[in-house]
Swiss-Prot record:
Keywords on record: Chlorophyll, Chromophore, Electron transport, Iron, Magnesium, Membrane, Metal-binding, Oxidoreductase, Photosynthesis, Photosystem II, Thylakoid, Transmembrane, Transmembrane helix, Transport
Keyword Magnesium among UniProt keywords: yes
Binding site for a plastoquinone: 213, 260
GO biological process: photosynthetic electron transport in photosystem II
Extra information: 2 of the reaction center chlorophylls (ChlD1 and ChlD2) are entirely coordinated by water.
Protein name in the entry: Photosystem II D2 protein
Gene: psbD1
């Protein structure tokens, strides 16, 4: 008897690498991991290095590291000096010329952290796409994560690209971000920008929806156990649901007169509201990068200038913004040597 055995198909290096990347292990790597893991490691490592050792004396004229006496809230990896423009500040570039200490002094770590951080976030979104495809589910998690990516890219990259240099981007630190928020308000009147309003509505609306949803599910859990702790009344692997959508619908119908009729619409709405808030915020920041104006109620400003007794919350905020600019410009940009004469400083009841 003759047995014919076929030859095993020859596997190329791509197939071998694909199998290794997608192997079932504790931490999934995948093709997205080639981008995510090194960039995330380098950006986090760069931030820890900068906040621990690197000064901002040469870029902002301030201390910004633990080594200089800062704490977690005041330490930061600060933006490059204004004179650097939009240079990528490569270690081997014409600015640092391979000198690591000089590179840190010029603000090279900020560009390093910002660019690697952006690619790390994109890699994390691609990771969610990849795992969703392998598991066989829809990629809505990745689509939702596009919101934080849009905000990061618009704030840390697009905004300074629209300004004169990386100097005007936020530095990577808690107090540094607060300073950037004050800067946006003083120079762009950001809180009166409609895209900021939509962003606030989306983020706070998403938090409200999350709280309501969690409370409603807890409220309508089946009473299928005698224990006071509801988590002891079910098995994590059971097939049947442990709460009543019908009861939840009835409850909210009595509260508001309307309620979500099915889970698909409910959860899509919970996805849509915060993600749209993040996207509209990102669009607004790109508008600020181009120095587009927010709402201007010029008639109120003219009347307030003519009538000392007329004042609105808008005109008070305009005066406050002028005060922010008059203080922040010389303090934040000492290299410009700004000097404001007394007659141009803001006056009025607001200050």
């Amino acid at each position: 008897m003759t047995i014919a055995a076929g030859r095993m198909p020859q596997r190329g290096w791509f197939d071998v690498l694909d199998d290794w990347l997608k192997r079932d292990r504790f931490v999934f790597v995948g093709w997205s991991g080639i981008l995510l893991l090194p960039t995330a490691y380098l950006s986090i490592g760069g931030w820890l290095t900068g906040t621990t050792f690197v000064t901002s004396w040469y870029t902002h004229g301030i201390a910004s590291s633990y080594l200089e006496g800062c704490n977690f809230l005041t330490a930061a990896v600060s933006t490059p000096a204004d004179a650097m423009g939009h240079s990528l500040l490569l270690l081997w570039g014409p600015e640092a010329q391979g000198d690591f200490v000089r590179w840190c002094q010029l603000g090279g770590l900020w560009a390093f952290v910002a660019l690697h951080g952006a690619f790390a976030l994109i890699g994390f979104m691609l990771r969610q796409f990849e795992i969703a495809r392998l598991v066989g589910i829809r990629p809505y998690n990745a689509i939702a994560f596009s919101g934080p990516i849009a905000v990061f890219v618009s704030v840390f990259l697009m905004y300074p690209l629209g300004q004169s240099s990386w100097f005007f981007a936020p530095s990577f630190g808690v107090a540094a971000i607060f300073r950037f928020l004050l800067f946006l308000q003083g120079f762009h009147n950001w809180t009166l920008n409609p895209f900021h309003m939509m962003g606030v509505a989306g983020i706070l609306g998403g938090a409200l929806l999350c709280a309501i949803h969690g409370a409603t599910v807890e409220n309508t859990l089946f009473e299928d156990g005698e224990q006071s702790n509801t988590f002891k009344a079910f098995e994590p692997t059971q097939e049947e649901e442990t709460y009543s959508m019908v009861t939840a619908n009835r409850f909210w119908s009595q509260i508001f007169g309307i309620a979500f009729s099915n889970k698909r619409w409910l959860h899509f709405f919970m996805l849509f509201v915060p993600v749209m808030g993040l996207w509209t915020s990102a669009i607004g920041i790109i508008g600020l990068a181009l120095n587009l104006r927010a709402y201007d109620f010029v008639s109120q400003e003219i009347r307030a200038a003519e009538d000392p007794e007329f004042e609105t919350f808008y005109t008070k905020n305009i005066l406050l913004n002028e005060g922010l600019r008059a203080w922040m410009a010389p303090a934040d940009q000492p290299h410009e040597n700004f000097v404001f004469p007394e007659e141009v400083l803001p006056r009025g009841n607001a200050l």
